[in-house]
């Protein structure tokens, strides 16, 4: 899609609702409003959506919001959150195996794991608003 990385669009968060609100406030006050905000987890995305509504933005008509994790928050908020589902159970099992191996004196430095994630499309995302 030829999207250029713009560091001004990256905001620090702390994986909670409040830091999602703070980051959204900064992004929503920019002169060139982004068409979408992707948060590092669903709690932050919920904060983004809340801040958007508090400032008169409609989601997804004015701005799309996407989270990560597919936590219960994603399907319980309004509009339901588009998010990325990752295989938490598989990841936790593998992390546990590696921890046990390391505790037993094994070398885990060369261990790799890859997981398939799934985009769960719900109502918080849509095509960008036509400018002009």
Descriptions of predicted regions:
Residues 1-132:
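Bacterial carbohydrate/catabolite-sensing allosteric modules
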